[in-house]
């Protein structure tokens, strides 16, 4: 079993928003990846973006700039 580490989890209302986030992050060299929404969190769709917790402000500004709507941003051990 892998060791859990603090992560920033960004959830979305729809799968389309999650996929759009993945595409934009790849195009703009933002680190992170799409993951299934962890059990500790409830979300509109089953996908979430996972990245380092110190990226919270950067990701919030990036999503606002790119027009990506998210449901929730939380830091959890993942």
Positions of the model-derived regions?
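A generic, residue-level signal for flexible/boundary positions that often mark functional hotspots
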Residues: 6, 28-31, 35, 62, ...
């Amino acid at each position: 079993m892998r060791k859990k580490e603090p992560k920033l989890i960004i959830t979305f209302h729809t799968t389309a928003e999650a996929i759009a986030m993945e595409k934009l992050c790849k195009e703009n060299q933002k680190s992170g990846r799409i993951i299934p929404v962890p059990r500790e969190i409830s979300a509109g769709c089953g996908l979430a973006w996972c990245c380092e917790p110190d990226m919270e402000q950067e990701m919030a500004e990036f999503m606002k700039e790119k027009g990506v709507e998210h449901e929730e941003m939380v830091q959890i051990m993942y």
